[in-house]
Amino acid sequence: MFVTVWSPTVIALALSFFYEGTSGVRSLLGLLFRGFSKNNLWYLIGILVPFAAVVSAIIIARYLHSGAAFLPLAALLFTFGLQVFTGAMGEELGWRGFLLSHLERGLSPRVAALVMAITWALWHLPAFFFPGMPQQHMPPIAFLLMVAAFGIFLALLFNRTRGHVVSTMLAHFSFNMGLAVGGAILGSVFIWTLAFIFSIVAIFSLARLSAHPSAQPTGEVFPPLGTRPLNDRLEACSLDPR
């Protein structure tokens, strides 16, 4: 599990090092420490919206008797610690910090968010084929729709906080903890309800994203991949170009 969820960040760091050397790695990691945006309201929105959406879906699922049940306190505390070091920290630097930043160099924030959301959703697809994963008990279409819609919301956060990855980490953590409140397996009613709620959030998020490419993408702090000569990139990796 840890290997899977940390793979986006590991790959992003590897690509940054290969193409840009240590400066690329420093630039990518700099997205974590670039300071909070002046518009701090978006950090609060990032925490409250996912949690409120998940809790609302849990309430609806429980009302409809779909089997949703809250976790015991001990399990909730364990899940809290687990989520700190898994999805939120393991994925966001790679998906939003690296890939979304580069997508926005050639695409509008709106189109980049859609491409990012679809890619991120499909990345979760193999979870349906591994025994013991909670996705095996969820409707695939609803789950993928939910993840893609949430990904669009994360793209909005990333842009509105000027590429501060901590904002999307907080939102991702809030979302995962919201799921934990209701337990890992909540039934199809819960997943479909959550997919519907986040679809509405995604529509509003797309409306707030620009439809036109910007000269300086919000999260961009390093040049496009491949801008350095091949020999320089090989030298950065301590390889002999000959």
Regions found by a protein language model. Give the residues of each.
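Juxtamembrane helix-entry segments on the extracytoplasmic side of multipass membrane proteins
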Residues: 68-81, 132-145
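Membrane-interface helix/loop boundary segments of multi-pass membrane proteins
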Residues: 90-117, 159-164
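Short, highly charged, low-complexity non-transmembrane loops/tails of multi-pass membrane proteins
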Residues: 214-237
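Residue-level signature of the transmembrane alpha-helical core
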Residues: 6, 47, 80-85, 114-121, ...
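Membrane-helix boundary elements
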Residues: 106, 110-135
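Aromatic-anchored segments of alpha-helical transmembrane domains
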Residues: 51-58, 118-127, 172-181
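Functionally important transmembrane alpha-helices
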Residues: 138-196
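Membrane-helix interface linkers and caps
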Residues: 1-45, 60-73, 157-163, 206-220
